[in-house]
Amino acid sequence: MTRRTPIELYRNIGISAHIDAGKTTTTERILFYTGITHKLGEVHEGAAVMDWMEQEQERGITITSAATTAFWRGMAGNYPEHRINIIDTPGHVDFTIEVERSMRVLDGACMVYDSVGGVQPQSETVWRQANKYRVPRIAFVNKMDRIGADFLRVQRQIVERLKGDAVPVQLPIGAEDNFQGVVDLVKMKAILWDEASQGVSFKYEDVPAPMLELANQWRDKLVEKAAEANEVLLEKYLSGEALSEEEIKTGLRQRTIANEIVPMLCGSAFKNKGVQAMLDAVLDYLPSPLDVPAIKGHDEHDKEIERRPSDKDPFSALAFKIMTDPFVGQLVFFRAYSGVVKSGDSVLNPLKNKKERLGRILQMHANERKEINEVYAGDIAAAVGLKDVTTGDTLTDPGHVIILERMIFPEPVISQAVEPKTKADQEKMSLALNRLAQEDPSFRVRTDEESGQTIISGMGELHLEILVDRMKREFNVEATVGKPQVAYRETIRKKVEGVEGKFVKQSGGRGQYGHAVITVEPQAAGKGFEFIDAIKGGVIPREFIPAVERGIVDTLNTGVLAGYPVVDVKVTLTFGSYHDVDSNENAFRMAGSMAFKEGLRRATPVLLEPMMQVEVETPEDFTGNVMGDLSSRRGMVQGMEDIAGGGGKLVRAEVPLAEMFGYSTSLRSLTQGRATYSMEFKHYAEAPRQVAEQVIAARTGSTRA
């Protein structure tokens, strides 16, 4: 079977937005117009095709990035058939990890904004992630039929808050109830969609006379932005010649792909207006796999190599999502960067050094699937039969190995104890939790050594709530959940040298002997743990040095203050001694552990707590109450700004997570239910002495801090 679509006609895009900006409805309309779904799924009826997990339908928020393939020839049918692979990404802060992992495999993104709310806190998070992976983007201002809709206000917010060069390629005709269609600034024509056909048919008309002046102003700006793409266009523009439609589009495309501008469009997905033109903009301005840099990685000898998006290059792909499907078992979603792979082929997972056979290959449409025989460079598909693959692993041709850069996932900030309700649930629960942890790298499961309880950790209360809910629905496990606990950390503040750990045991015949001397010092925040071997003259034999490191690593999980994991510490092994007969790995492991514990005690240990970036949108009357309440929670208010359109105030603050439990309830009572807030993890900071003493006392019964 040969490739159906040439690679230059591929678009791998994400649809990304703040919760409630109408992203799922927008995706639904895309599926409808591209001819896949016949009845439009409305989110508020709980019927959207992309939101295919039960909890998503109940909560009306999108949790899992479902990948969908659609074909598009332009709304006037005047383009060659393009293949659009769409990754639907969640908009809730607790699922930022989902957005992050889909950004990694996209070539372009469509950012959806609410015409009234504009740039909201989550929009900023998503924008930062898109910047991190240098993803070119277009913006779609949705819900133009809402009261208070203002397209140009959103344009200003993108420029001021996100520092993006937002370039309108359309202007809305009317707004709120009077929203009729858009002015296409490239063609300088009005586009009006026919409501009877649910927006499938449309007509071009002249720009309405009252809008001509505004349209000409914005068109001049648009043409200037396009002309700056290259010298040929710039010269033509400066000499006063008019640029053709094609030249304007070429210039805008070049600058969008270079991440210099963000073309802006508008519409109302719910009213079937504007989504079709937004799809045309995806073809016009967002990159194909050929327009983005070749993917880089390392071979097995750590030499940097790259793979071009060509069917002729050896096969390479990145597994970006694992899902458990009730019918086919584990599904691995992957993005093929180069080469071709067929079902039945063997691929290598170089990180685990395991060869695996690709069973069936499926092309996904929300939660429906079509079996295909092969996958070409640039495509996104799901494979059945890969047992040991986790998110972020590379899949490669066994004869031409490449290891692509791994994804980095944030550490969880919140934990809960979870217990099965019955003995029968016990086994099912550990299976369910392991499955869920395999799917979601920001979710961790461990057993507390002292209490024997199972502890689950994640990125927020909603994150854990949904995972427990899934355990009940998908695995029939009834569980009781404890109160959320903060994931504290420990670190040190000073350097100590010459710390000794000596493990000596005489028992009858053969004894045990291990002796290590270390230097322990703090590292910059986020640097993690580092071990340096500075042994000279063989005072500790080579074969025992890894054992010393292992002993230290074992101890990292339980700090000396309250037993929390230790972070950002550097340990240098400087000296030691051994015994010809009695020394062994275990003895040196114990010596390493003893030295490290002693080093931590002497190096001024401190407790770290997670700090959250909190943003509250509140009516002006309640601003004082909200700020006072945040301060009482040990929050540092960092600023306040007006919400455009007289919509109250946006208060930004940094607050310890420990003080934020139950915040939504108290915010409701403070503001009569009229304020909303969002919260995301910012960084770890040293806990004040009084707080540290309370935490330590609760864990250990003593208050040493």
Curated annotation (Swiss-Prot):
Protein's name according to its UniProt entry: Elongation factor G 2
The species this protein was found in: Bordetella avium (strain 197N)
Family named by the database record: Belongs to the TRAFAC class translation factor GTPase superfamily. Classic translation factor GTPase family. EF-G/EF-2 subfamily.
Domain tr-type G: start-end pairs: 8-290
InterPro entries cross-referenced by the UniProt entry: EFG_II (IPR041095), EFG_III (IPR009022), EFG_III/V (IPR035647), EFG_IV (IPR047872), EFG_V (IPR035649), EFG_V-like (IPR000640), EFTu-like_2 (IPR004161), G_TR_CS (IPR031157)
Gene3D superfamilies: 3.30.230.10, 3.30.70.240, Elongation Factor G (Translational Gtpase), domain 3, P-loop containing nucleotide triphosphate hydrolases, Translation factors
HAMAP family listed in its UniProt record: EF_G_EF_2_B
Record bears the keyword Glycoprotein: no
Entry's Gene Ontology cellular component terms: cytoplasm
UniProt function note: Catalyzes the GTP-dependent ribosomal translocation step during translation elongation. During this step, the ribosome changes from the pre-translocational (PRE) to the post-translocational (POST) state as the newly formed A-site-bound peptidyl-tRNA and P-site-bound deacylated tRNA move to the P and E sites, respectively. Catalyzes the coordinated movement of the two tRNA molecules, the mRNA and conformational changes in the ribosome.
Residues reported in the UniProt entry to bind GTP: 17-24, 88-92, 142-145
